[in-house]
């Protein structure tokens, strides 16, 4: 059993009111993505539970590879689904966890219109479907990017709001995530929808997609190919980070214990480090070095100007959540080992 699999099982053993999910249908969009896929794995690790998990994604082949161990489990169902289109059919979904969103920066430059449409219209379509099909709670997976640029070095709380330059294509992601959050709260106010929101910090872990060009994915690929770690900035940006199993577990705490209409930051307060620190740690673990390269113009377009993005998690921790055992260096090592296992 891999270390990652142990993390999944340990997350599934958390002291949560799992009985709330009994005999319920749970829809997870973005199920082949980094966070959504991990969430599906944690839910399916409860073999004795009677709920059904509906994993929605665009790529059935990728889903089969990811969820092969569950594919013939009667409680697991794959739905071919593109978030930009309305959900078809008449299936009842008591819980909808909306984790589908293209968070890869390269697409912020290539397809900003599609990013906005999928984040806003996709959220509205899912809530409307749920309202007519037995929805009990809607969990929206937003992003820490909604905070924008803060002032000074203060950790963001859920009531903070920083500056986002809306007159740039790069704003397509944080601005549409903000709009989708407001949409959730508006549905709660006008139609009584029970909606909760999570704002994950920078999340890392195994099973990211091949098209994901976020910085940690690039670094991991360098390691897997036996290359030096390539950086295209000075890497001084400070970030809150969270291991994917910790993030998915936090989402379940919010789903089952969170207060209606509220938003919750997700971050590991013991994992605050710069992008350069991550690069140097991975290089050290792999016996390589960090090298610097000049970014291409297309890459510069999607660089964020946010130098400090650290999140306070008091509100989340008040629900009972805490990260799994192990420091971030160990969890990076788990990520590499799982990716190597997958490659073999």
Sequence positions of predicted segments:
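Amphipathic terminal alpha-helices
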Residues: 1-20, 50-51, 326-344
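N-terminal Rossmann NAD(P)H-binding glycine-rich loop of SDR-like oxidoreductase domains
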Residues: 25-45
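NAD(P)H-binding glycine-rich loop region in Rossmannoid oxidoreductase-like domains
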Residues: 80-118
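Conserved Rossmann-fold NAD(P)-dependent oxidoreductase catalytic core, especially the SDR/UDP-sugar
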Residues: 98, 124-171
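Active-site Tyr-X1-5-Lys
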Residues: 168-196, 224-225
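Glycine/proline-rich active-site loop of Rossmann-fold NAD(P)-dependent oxidoreductases
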Residues: 178, 194, 203-218, 227, ...
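Conserved C-terminal active-site "lid" loop/helix of NAD(P)H-dependent oxidoreductases
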Residues: 244, 277, 299-323
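Mid/C-terminal beta-alpha module of Rossmann-like enzyme folds, strongest
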Residues: 257-301
């Amino acid at each position: 059993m891999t270390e990652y699999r142990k993390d999944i099982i340990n997350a599934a053993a958390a002291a949560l009111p799992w009985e709330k999910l009994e005999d319920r249908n749970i829809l997870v969009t973005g199920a082949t993505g980094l966070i959504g896929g991990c969430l599906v794995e944690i839910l399916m690790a409860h073999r004795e539970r009677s709920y059904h998990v509906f994993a929605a994604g665009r790529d059935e082949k990728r889903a089969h590879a990811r969820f092969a161990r569950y594919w013939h489990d009667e409680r697991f169902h794959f739905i071919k689904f593109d978030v930009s289109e309305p959900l078809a059919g008449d299936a009842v979904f008591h819980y909808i966890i909306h984790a589908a969103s293209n968070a890869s920066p390269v697409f912020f430059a290539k397809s900003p219109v599609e990013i906005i449409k999928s984040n806003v219209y996709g959220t509205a379509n899912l809530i409307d479907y749920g309202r007519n099909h037995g929805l009990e709670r809607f969990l929206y997976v937003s992003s820490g990017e909604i905070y924008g640029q803060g002032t000074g070095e203060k950790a963001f709380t859920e009531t903070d709001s920083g500056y986002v330059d809306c007159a740039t294509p790069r704003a397509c992601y944080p601005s549409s995530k903000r709009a989708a959050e407001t949409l959730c709260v508006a549905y709660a106010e006008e139609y009584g929808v029970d909606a909760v929101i999570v704002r994950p910090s920078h999340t890392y872990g195994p099973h990211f997609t091949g098209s994901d060009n976020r910085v940690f994915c690039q670094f991991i690929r360098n390691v897997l190919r036996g290359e030096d770690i390539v950086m295209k900035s000075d890497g001084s940006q400070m970030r809150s980070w969270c291991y994917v199993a910790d993030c998915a577990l936090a989402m379940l705490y919010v789903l089952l214990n969170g207060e209606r209409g509220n938003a919750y930051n997700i971050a590991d307060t013991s994992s605050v480090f710069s992008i350069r620190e991550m690069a140097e740690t991975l290089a050290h673990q792999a016996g390589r070095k960090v090298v610097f390269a000049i970014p291409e113009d297309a890459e510069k377009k999607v660089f964020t100007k946010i130098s400090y993005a650290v999140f306070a998690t008091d509100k989340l921790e008040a629900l009972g959540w805490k990260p799994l055992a192990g420091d971030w260096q160990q969890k990076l090592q788990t990520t590499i080992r799982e990716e190597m296992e997958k490659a073999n």
